[in-house]
């Protein structure tokens, strides 16, 4: 399955494009920080240091060639006559050899190879990307970059923002606990965070009838809002460098580049859950329900209301938008 889906040339092209996207989104996020009037020069220095030191960890595919995998699987020898202990010993040997072969397996497991996921680890200031995140609906080489920035770009921006959310902002560039914010800045950040809590607390999930827990979901809500903003600004930078509109996709001709970006983001959270699943997620999941990851997040984005010309004061263009990472104050 792996080698039918990917090959060395394709992986190299994907990594090249994604690395460029990461650089653009980091640049975009750096501008968001630099424009903050409530953050002083000393704090900005630490923030830039952390952002510049933030690493990206991809799977090293050289260790997963067909020949290498066949050699490893030769150690998995089972017959009808094999005892349980023999089978267990064979699996143990395979696991040891595989771990030795792949030094990164302690950070990225083989079983999650195709899971579409990325994760920020604050104690290492590192974002890990599973291979599945480089496939639809997050990324596709054949689609315009509006889809890729709205999908994977948002994911990248989301994880970067975690480095500066209510938890990540307490850690340094090398992943150690460090207070690099002034008391006044922490107070302002907390005030802005409280506004997010209040906003999301008002959201009522239709299936369960429960209100969203804005405190439980705070970090993810900050990351959603900051991630979309950083990715969109990075996409605009890409368009400026391109010097023209992207090619249109049949069936989507009526949408602008900017609108396609937000459509790509929104379709990531097209979902349906049972009452039991919804109830469990509402009580335990640090993410807001998918509906509000789209509607509330985009309602806070001026770029969204500008792109779709939403009426001022409407649900998708409220006068009082809640933001942490925006131009100026």
Could you describe each region identified by the protein language model?
Residues 2-329:
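Intrinsically disordered, low-complexity linker/terminal regions across diverse proteins
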């Amino acid at each position: 399955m792996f080698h039918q889906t990917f090959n060395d040339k394709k992986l190299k092209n994907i990594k090249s494009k994604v690395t460029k996207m990461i650089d653009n989104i980091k640049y975009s996020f750096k501008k968001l920080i630099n424009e903050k009037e409530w953050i002083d020069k000393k704090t900005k220095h630490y923030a830039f240091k952390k952002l510049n030191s933030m690493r990206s960890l991809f799977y090293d595919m050289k260790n997963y060639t067909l020949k290498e995998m066949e050699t490893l699987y030769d150690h998995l020898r089972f017959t009808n006559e094999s005892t349980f202990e023999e089978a267990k010993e064979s699996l143990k040997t395979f696991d040891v050899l595989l771990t030795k072969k792949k030094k990164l397996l302690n950070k990225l497991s083989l079983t999650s190879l195709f899971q579409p996921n990325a994760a920020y680890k604050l104690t290492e200031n590192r974002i890990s990307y599973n291979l599945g995140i480089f496939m639809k609906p997050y990324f596709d080489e054949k689609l315009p970059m509006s889809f890729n920035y709205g999908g994977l770009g948002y994911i990248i921006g989301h994880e970067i923002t975690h480095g500066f959310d209510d938890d990540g902002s307490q850690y340094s560039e090398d992943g150690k606990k460090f207070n690099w914010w002034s008391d006044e800045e922490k107070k302002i950040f907390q005030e802005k965070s409280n506004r997010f809590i209040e906003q999301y607390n008002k959201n009522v999930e239709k299936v369960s009838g429960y209100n969203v827990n804005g405190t439980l979901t705070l970090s993810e809500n900050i990351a959603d809002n900051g991630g979309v903003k950083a990715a969109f600004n990075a996409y605009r930078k890409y368009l400026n460098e391109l010097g023209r509109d992207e090619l249109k996709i049949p069936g989507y001709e009526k949408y602008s580049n900017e609108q396609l970006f937000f459509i790509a983001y929104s379709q990531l959270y097209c979902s349906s859950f049972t009452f039991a699943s919804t109830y469990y997620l509402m009580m335990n999941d640090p993410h807001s329900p998918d509906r509000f990851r789209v509607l509330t997040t985009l309602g806070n984005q001026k770029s969204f209301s500008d792109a779709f010309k939403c009426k001022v004061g409407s649900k998708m263009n409220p006068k009082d938008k809640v933001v942490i990472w925006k131009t100026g104050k």
